[in-house]
Amino acid sequence: MKVAYFDCAAGIAGDMCLGALLDCGLPLEYLNQQLQALGLEGEYSLQVCRVQRCGQPALQAVVEVLDESPPARPWREIQALIAGSRLAPAVKARSLKVFEKLAQAEAKVHQVPLETVHFHEVGAVDALVDIVGTCVGLDWLQVERVISSPHPIGGGWVDTEHGKLAVPVPAVIELWEMGRVPVFSNGVEAELVTPTGAALAVALAEAFGPCPPLRLEKVGRGAGSRELPIPNIFRLWIGQSQGEEPTEIVSVLQTQIDDLNPQVIAYTCEQLLALGAWDVFTQPITMKQGRPGVLLTVICPPERVPECQDFIFRETTTLGIRHSQQQRTVLERRIERVETPYGLVDIKVACRHGHIVNAQPEFRDCVARAQEFRVPVQTVWLAAQAAWQKRLQGDPA
């Protein structure tokens, strides 16, 4: 699996990511060609130059906005612009995910609905080029997984459209909270992490921590715009994962309930899954004074904790929720489709170290085919397993 590691020892910004990707070999001509899909010709110019930061070489990408008063584009306009473009589906998906995180942070900072967010500091033209360009570069490098180092908090003050703001600026803090990003001080008093850089890391990184075992292929160095007491360089490590299954951070919410209608508990579980929880389950327990109750457990992405927690408080009688973060190890997974006498059925395939360790027919497909042909579900399931085994043996059935 191709992995990209964001080394943010000196910080991260959109232009630094772009510079590092170009330093990794992303052709500038290809990048410009892909960015044309946004229809921003005449609104910006992209310049690239080799520079030094504290004596270390790096590539600096400079996005110059040509309009002195560029329009403030609302989130919905940016969403439509990217979704309706000719960009590759994977580039669109990553770009929209980054902008959505950015919009969520801005909405929380300014206390406005998500759909009314307008991008000013972060946005519009330069943010589009930085974010979409970074996603184009990751796609060109065929990166499947992103991991990031902790982020430096920086310090001091910056001038913005809203006046002087303390570093880190509010949008960056919101993004860090969203992604449960580990932070530290490297002693430098400057803006080291921009909202665009934080959004790229929070949206794209599956985990934050040390670099995993890699067979290193390339290291790209993207320069920041200023000289600092330390090399103002973002390093991008590209390599193949070695020997370890991917790990990711999950949030676990738990609460005990002994005074709620069981029908409401069933409804709560369904709705939590609809809100984005990965798994929801209950266990029977005995509580104080011998009362029977249930332990409700929710496993969800860290960014879904606020919504899941609010829903539990609103719909149940609990007075408190425990939450923790855990690491989980996951196998590489893919979906393959087989032909059976009852139609097509998806097979969920799990791999470890490049070898298949498990393959199971998708149960929903089996149910649908069984209902269509009026046969037992087990009959369809066995037919799908047989078709999969034939494929493994080289028979294209």
From Swiss-Prot:
Which keywords are on file for this protein? Nickel
Molecular function GO labels: lyase activity; nickel cation binding
Gene3D superfamilies for the chain:
mk0293 like domain, Transcriptional regulatory protein pf0864 domain like
SS bond list = none
Q: Identify the HAMAP family for this entry.
A: LarC
Q: Which family does it belong to?
A: Belongs to the LarC family.
Q: What is this protein called?
A: Putative nickel insertion protein
